[in-house]
């Protein structure tokens, strides 16, 4: 791991000690020996990593319906589902989701440089692909929720998932060449590299403040409060180490007139900086969300306790199950209030518990108190639930996006469904229907929490399967592969885990697996950058 310390100290040195040469290179001057050694380290690290990764996939994804990408599944396909077709549909969901995510990131760079009007055709293509993928995820969720009546019905649904994924990929592939011509990374490599170096430095300046925010959360809250971002600073630094190496190599390629190579290095660096920014943003956002939850909690508790008093007075003599529900709500609220004064606590979890208790009481009182007071109370619960749902959705989205090299179809399906319910909650809220919006927001939160749990499970399994003989990954390459920034590998393995056109070396002394590009399955591993 010596390269980690070298690269990170180089990166921080560019910020704190020396602004660097006028050409804007990240390292503040490139040593003739250091960069070749760094390139060699990256090549060896990717080779080791992809060997372990391929061994993992050989024992997982290539065994239909037993274990597919992203974690274990039942030993046999569910009744009514073809094992091979089920495995293929799950793999297609993962691959298509990766293609759409990468295309969205690349589209952001194009819009920033060329404007929304020039990028409009590609925005439309990504929107189409995202919609097709969302429908496919919805079908997968329905299969997970309710088994098909027979194999014919299961085949029809699985065929639909595969077809939707194919349509999404085809739409992205169809415009990938035009996208390359718009970005023109090879032609505009010097300007593009300079822009990426500027973005790198700007993000690097934010890391100490984000680290301080994480330390403050550790001091103030219970561990569960900051758990979703506990490792984010370390991972952000890991991505920045990889970006340092990639940007230095891109700058060298530009200076030597090797613009095609510079374009490949640049895309890798841009992907790493983007993920590092997501991780840093996530820490800052979590700190703000916890502060907001702590601020909202007293009023939320007071409102729920008022409901509890009303319920106790109005429901005397009611059926046994109703007073029982009130008693359970009373117990939860008592535990939350006690927890807030007994030491560090998790304000987000506390607010969630209060919302759940309040929603139960609101349901009990809905037919008793007047509509004006009832709707006002539901709106208050919706505001509180919206915070917890938005926080859970953001945490899951960030984790899946920055670990997509290991996250499988189950986590992604739950995340897609969480997003769908969240959008529905927002629509109903905007239509002044708090009673309709509240259960949608609560469902979104539950699905997002489940998605994060499944994604973390996938990453743990991914890391465990590397085995005790894994020599370790340096230069930030491990994080780059885990984050889906680097595709393929030295063994010619494709991004879909079956081998193919995405693998192999650059042929120019570069790392074996290249970065992803805008496009679907047929084009996202291309090397060119547009001329």
Describe each PLM feature range:
Residues 1-531:
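Long, charged/polar, soluble alpha-helical segments
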């Amino acid at each position: 791991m010596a390269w980690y310390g070298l690269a990170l100290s180089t990166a921080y040195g560019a910020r704190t000690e020396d602004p660097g040469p006028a050409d804007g290179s990240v390292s503040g001057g490139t040593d003739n020996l250091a960069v070749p050694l760094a390139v060699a380290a990256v090549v060896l690290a990717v080779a080791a990593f992809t060997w372990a990764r391929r061994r993992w996939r050989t024992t997982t994804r290539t065994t239909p319906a037993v274990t597919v990408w992203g974690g274990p599944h039942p030993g046999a396909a569910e009744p009514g589902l073809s094992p091979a077709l089920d495995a293929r549909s799950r793999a297609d969901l993962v691959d298509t989701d990766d293609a759409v995510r990468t295309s969205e990131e690349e589209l952001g760079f194009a819009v920033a440089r060329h404007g929304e009007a020039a990028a409009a055709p590609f925005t439309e293509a990504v929107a189409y692909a995202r919609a097709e993928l969302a429908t496919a995820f919805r079908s997968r969720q329905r299969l997970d929720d309710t088994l098909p009546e027979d194999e014919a019905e299961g085949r029809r649904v699985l065929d639909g998932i595969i077809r939707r994924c194919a349509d999404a990929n085809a739409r992205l592939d169809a415009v990938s060449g035009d996208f390359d011509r718009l970005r023109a990374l090879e032609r505009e490599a010097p300007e593009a590299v300079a822009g990426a170096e500027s973005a790198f430095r700007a993000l690097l300046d934010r890391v100490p403040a984000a680290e301080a925010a994480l330390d403050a959360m550790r001091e103030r809250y219970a561990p569960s409060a900051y758990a979703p971002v506990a490792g984010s600073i370390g991972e952000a630094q890991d991505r920045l180490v990889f970006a340092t190496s990639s940007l230095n190599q891109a700058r060298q390629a530009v200076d030597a007139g090797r613009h095609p190579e510079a374009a490949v290095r640049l895309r890798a660096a841009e992907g790493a900086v983007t993920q590092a920014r997501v991780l840093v943003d996530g820490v800052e956002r979590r700190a703000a969300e916890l502060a907001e939850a702590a601020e909202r909690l007293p009023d939320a508790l007071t409102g729920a306790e008022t409901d509890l008093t009303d319920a106790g007075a109005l429901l005397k003599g009611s059926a046994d199950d109703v007073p029982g529900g009130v008693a359970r709500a009373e117990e939860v609220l008592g535990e939350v209030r006690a927890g807030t004064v007994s030491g560090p606590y998790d304000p987000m979890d506390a607010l969630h518990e209060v919302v759940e208790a309040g929603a139960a009481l609101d349901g009990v009182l809905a037919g008793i108190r007047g509509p004006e007071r009832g709707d006002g109370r539901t709106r208050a619960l919706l505001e509180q639930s919206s915070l917890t749902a938005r926080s859970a959705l953001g945490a899951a989205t960030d984790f899946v996006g920055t670990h997509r090299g290991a996250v499988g179809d189950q986590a992604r399906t739950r995340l897609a469904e969480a997003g769908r319910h969240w959008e529905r909650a927002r629509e109903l809220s905007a239509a002044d229907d708090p009673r309709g919006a509240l259960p949608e927001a609560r469902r979104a939160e539950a699905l997002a929490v489940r998605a994060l749990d499944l994604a973390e499970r996938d990453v743990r399994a991914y890391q465990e399967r590397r085995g005790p003989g894994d020599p370790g990954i340096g230069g930030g390459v491990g994080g780059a592969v885990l984050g889906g920034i680097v595709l393929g590998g030295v063994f010619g393995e494709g991004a879909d885990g079956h081998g193919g056109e995405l693998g192999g070396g650059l042929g120019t002394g570069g790392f074996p697996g290249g970065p992803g590009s805008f496009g679907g399955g047929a084009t996202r591993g291309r090397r060119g950058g547009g001329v």
